[in-house]
């Protein structure tokens, strides 16, 4: 065939994705962001999307087995990123830059 196609359903929404070999390849210019309420959700989506050949990337990014890019980010990170306290913003950013899968407990100083 000229392309690989996959169907998936995310929270009730159907998606059809395709990779057309050298014609159209997935890249990081297009990614899905999953905002997670807690570490349990981060772990769930991270494990599911990296299974069967997916690849971990830096800073909460990963590629699924089809090569599609995802960002799995806890809502706590977005809250810290927008926090009025610049030190909290900076700490969270520096922490995420050292991670692959984001660990919620490590986003704030102890």
Q: For each of these PLM feature ranges, what is it?
A:
Residues 1-56, 63-110:
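Glyoxalase I/VOC metalloenzyme domain signal
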């Amino acid at each position: 065939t000229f392309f690989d196609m996959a169907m998936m359903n995310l929270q009730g929404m159907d998606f059809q994705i395709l990779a057309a070999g050298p014609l159209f390849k997935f890249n990081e210019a297009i990614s899905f962001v999953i905002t997670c309420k807690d570490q349990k959700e981060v772990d769930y989506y991270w494990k599911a999307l990296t299974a069967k050949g997916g690849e971990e990337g830096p800073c909460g990014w990963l590629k699924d087995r089809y090569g599609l890019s995802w960002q799995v980010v806890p809502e706590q990170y977005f809250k810290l990123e927008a926090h009025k306290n610049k030190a909290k913003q900076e700490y969270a950013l520096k922490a995420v830059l050292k991670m692959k899968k984001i660990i919620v407990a490590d986003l704030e100083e102890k």
